[in-house]
Amino acid sequence: MIKYILLVVLLTSSLEGLKLHKKRTNFENVPKFKTLYTDQYLDHFNKRDDRTYKQRFLVNDEWFNPNDGPVFFYAGNEGDIESFWNNTGFMFDIAPVFQALVVFPEHRYYGESLPFGDSSFDQDKIGFLSVEQTMADYAVLLTKLQQDYNLCRKKNPIIAFGGSYGGILAAYMRYKYPNIVRGALAASAPIYLTAGLAPSTLFFQDVTNDFDKEPGCVPLVRQAFDAMENAAKQGDYKLLSEKFKLCEPISDAAGYKHLLLWMRNAFTIMAMVDYPYPASFLGDLPAWPVRFACQQLVNDTAKGVDILSSFKNLASILYNDTSKCFDIYEQFIECADPTSCGLGNDAKSWDYQACTELNTVQETNGVSDMFPVISYNEELREQYCLKTWGVKVRKEWPSIQFWGKHIKTATNIVFSNGLLDPWHNGGPLTNVSDSLVAVIIEDGAHHLDLRGSDPNDPQSVKIARYLEIEQIIKWIEEARKEPCEKF
Amino acid sequence: MIKYILLVVLLTSSLEGLKLHKKRTNFENVPKFKTLYTDQYLDHFNKRDDRTYKQRFLVNDEWFNPNDGPVFFYAGNEGDIESFWNNTGFMFDIAPVFQALVVFPEHRYYGESLPFGDSSFDQDKIGFLSVEQTMADYAVLLTKLQQDYNLCRKKNPIIAFGGSYGGILAAYMRYKYPNIVRGALAASAPIYLTAGLAPSTLFFQDVTNDFDKEPGCVPLVRQAFDAMENAAKQGDYKLLSEKFKLCEPISDAAGYKHLLLWMRNAFTIMAMVDYPYPASFLGDLPAWPVRFACQQLVNDTAKGVDILSSFKNLASILYNDTSKCFDIYEQFIECADPTSCGLGNDAKSWDYQACTELNTVQETNGVSDMFPVISYNEELREQYCLKTWGVKVRKEWPSIQFWGKHIKTATNIVFSNGLLDPWHNGGPLTNVSDSLVAVIIEDGAHHLDLRGSDPNDPQSVKIARYLEIEQIIKWIEEARKEPCEKF
């Protein structure tokens, strides 16, 4: 208890944040982990299916005190678990103080945790990828760990952490397995949006708002998209291909649409990871990439660079042109979730999830946002998902299974959201109850609070982390009142 | 609101119970129902599987007031849903006062709701029978009904009812789908026991305690089992076959064991349905069958009837000897759950569930109970389940998935238990929190409170029903505070 008080005093007195590890951005001081594997049932809900797969999980127990250390559990989301280990420094900043055991299980069908290796993404094998199966994996693993480490509920409460879809999973774990997870920090978790309860134009409107904070930026972006539109209308795909230095020139409307999607994606990513320092989370980006991009665009055009070339220069902040040209078909892949498309296995799995349990229908209209009209609605999603994955979208399922807006009965969850994050309007922004607490980070982008402390952190994220620590301490103290039972 | 106050006044002033329907036992006044069917996904958790099946559900809307009537939802359990409609009169006693819509969905793989018809029980088809799939069926159906009837959360809160395994499901629905179910009456729901958290000798010890309330009964039962044991030791299966009037004589230790199980089962059933009036729920039995059986046993032996014949006479209270003999192989089938074995499809499904998610390992030792030693433990269960269903028992799953003893985060559940019910020690007998309320019925057997009001009801069940109504009103009033939103 005393150590927690010290921690809070430290935080409140200076609000300088925790400085146990600096320079998180280069992963230089990221703590080591042990890589372990556990056998999980492929199908937790069909007991006739005895097949198992190897789930990877990362563990650090160097600070763990079995007598009263909690378990810090990161709810692995849509990617290689090591990348989340390298981008969730907040947990390592506070784990030594809490003397916590740190566990990062990998989400099934991502990273190394592929039930059927590279053929996991075949239509007849992908069906075991679901939010429910994943949560069951986590519940079973955590129960196993409490046996292996001889943990008890009183001394070693489990706190879930997660960002984005991982934050959604952390919250859901508290909804569905409060017997196992004592509390959850759900950072940037757009739970309402993914349950299909947000307008489809919300996301890109908020991307636009981010860029609109920079003087003169949005009008130039609109001007650039207009210039593209004019060229396309005249069939001048050659001009566009040259101006944007495309490795593979476009020659028709479909190619033009792909160029627009690639361009729009640059704004999406910069808005999402608008961090106050250089970071390489969704691409190598400079500090405050939105400001950086806008200033460059304004400066370029002021210098007389034509608008299309200036626009290409903006894209090159995110995209590599190592071959002296841009491969827009490699750098952006059309998929079910227009905000997150990529190459490789992880992108395939995410695409399947965006067709099943995560509603991510976002579109632009050029009115409430600065982008060209690119329609995407439930009907188009349904067509795409049937064609690509052979699945009929079960539209109502997510809000039935994961409670939609009716989450009042849950307890011990922090929903944190940064106002720079275009996802923030998709989640709870005010307290739902005394123990469903909303934390707002005025100058924060996508789950900035989960990242390690940095000298450039704005005050608002330091305060957010303080509030989160306060809640975590509350959850741990709550556990102390219970007998020392197994989970 | 006023009508509820009237209801409570009525109940508290007289405590005579609700007399809207009498003579429930003969089903004479059981309200009518509409039989409806809905398409349900066979696999709610694998979106690649688009197969559906027809789930039956029964509806009565004759009293329903859409403006403020709740939905009374019975969580169908292991049998034909019509049999539960005919044995859950409490809901019909109060539904007119609450102006409730009454819905009884049938549990998948029971009654008519067989996904693959008669071949549903093949090893390659049974795997879609699970508690999780069943709960998803209910959640999806209830969401569909709110659309069909244009219900909203404020005006039409859904209250779940269930007895025994149905009570477990009602409670679980509130654990996992509190967005849909506002409160649950879980009658005689041994949630701890089925999660594997009770000693294997508990159940039959409580059966013994029931019979021990009748003077002179247990010593005679022990004497009778001893006499059987003596005959068996001498290999005198002929004597046993004659005394028990077996249609098919037994001739070896296996046959003898089956006779013992058949005999023990008579006690099990009589203890479970030790109701204050004749009932035909798990067999046609007289009022207070435990007392009836004991008095007959005592009288028979007092009259000089030999102990084995007296014992056979006791069994005949439950079992039919229409062919002038007892077919013990038809009247009792050995299975995974030694407390509930029978013939037919429903029994097959229950057997599978007892091998998967419902731990029902009960055994007798002749010390803490009055029965011969019949061992049954996890190891024997595992062997049986592997042999019969080809499933490896996942022993820890039920307490991981359904919270075991750690249910404190749930709200709005009444756990009612009758002290005559041998299952009562398997569930919560004291309040877990302000809104997880234990109701004890001193003179009640297995979910007597869910049955319709009867002139012979003991005072304790009338009080229990009053307490339950009080909670239901509380849940409905809670819903009134919310906006009129969809589920």
Language model: regions and residue ranges:
Chain A
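Alpha/beta-hydrolase active-site loop
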Residues: 125-149
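Short beta-strand/loop motif that positions the catalytic acidic residue
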Residues: 409, 415-417
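Catalytic-loop region of hydrolases
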Residues: 2-101, 112, 121, 420, ...
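Alpha/beta-hydrolase fold nucleophile elbow
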Residues: 151-165
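Small-residue-rich helix-loop
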Residues: 322, 329-398
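Glycine-rich "HGGG/HGxG" loop immediately N-terminal to the catalytic nucleophile
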Residues: 109-124, 449
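Alpha/beta-hydrolase
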Residues: 163, 169-351
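Conserved alpha/beta-hydrolase "acid-adjacent" motif
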Residues: 417-418, 422-427
